[in-house]
Structures are given as structure tokens and as C-alpha cells.
Amino acid sequence: TVLILGTGGTHNTTSAVAKDKGAARVLTVSRHPDPEKGELSYAEAVHSGADIVINTTPAGMYPNVGVCHLDVAAMPGLEAVLDVVYNPDKTELILRAEEAGVPVAVGGLEMLVAQAVYAAEYFLDRKFDDAPAEIRAITAQLRKEQLNVALIGMPSCGKTTIGRALADRL
């Protein structure tokens, strides 16, 4: 069972792909559920028996980074949580999924890069030799450029020394 958070355009695409890939059930969650459309509330979603959760809403996107409407810790048996939000790299939903021990928790940066790579193939009318490898490499480079390191500690505990060593390696 795939549980999709949100009802917009990305939901429609995600739902179509989930069905195409053989999902037994695809359920939709909304802040304002329409029972006639079979939509669930976030409270109901926790008890849906979902295997995979996909967030297609802007919840958790910068600057509202602490927002998370779904209690994934109360959803035993989750196999994966995917979030289309790419800024921050790890949304509150992804952080909570990792904390709950969900085996796969992935943010939206790789999806954003994949869209760009496949759009480039389309508009340039040529295929990249290894698009998946290209996507992984670009995503890794972007993460390296975006993420930072904060060293915290008491005076004279070695922050400067560690900072210099990191600067040499990064």
C-alpha cells in the first residue's frame, strides 16, 4: 500500500507511477479530506497499513522546516518514506522516519536532479551514457556544496584543529 500525502499535481503523477509499478492500493491523505473521493485525514493515515509514504506537499520546505503532519513513528511496518521536498535535504518527515528506523528515507533532491537530467536528454535529443550514475554524481556534488559542518565545544577542546583538518579534506 502506497500512502500519498497531498492532492495536487505531483500527487497525480506519483499515484499513476505507483499504480503502474503494481501498488496493491494507493491511498490519498489531505488536510481537508473529501470522503467522497476516498481521501484520508492524517490521523486516519497512521492506521492505513501503508508500506510506503510519499509526501507531495510543501510541508517541511524551507523556511517552515519543522513542519511534519504525519506520525511515522506510529506506523509499524513502513518500508520507505519519500519526500519530494528538496530544501532542506532532510525534511522533518525524513528525519522522523530515520529516527523510527524506516529502512529507506529519501528526500527530493535526487528527484529534482533526475528531472533536470531527463529534461536535458529530451531537449538536447540525446541520451546520456549512464543517466542514473550521472544523477547520483550530480546529487552528491550538490549535497557536498549545500551541507555544512558546525563544530561545537568548550574552549580549547580542539575545534580549530578539527576545523583545519576538515578544511584540508573537504
Please provide the spans of the model-predicted regions.
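Glycine-rich adenosine-cofactor-binding loop
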Residues: 1-19, 23, 153-155
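NAD(P)-binding Rossmann-fold cofactor-contacting core
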Residues: 20-38
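Conserved lysine of the Walker
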Residues: 159
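Conserved S-adenosyl-L-methionine
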Residues: 20-25, 99-103, 169
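Adenosine-phosphate binding glycine-rich loop
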Residues: 84-147
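Rossmann-like adenosine-cofactor binding region
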Residues: 37-105
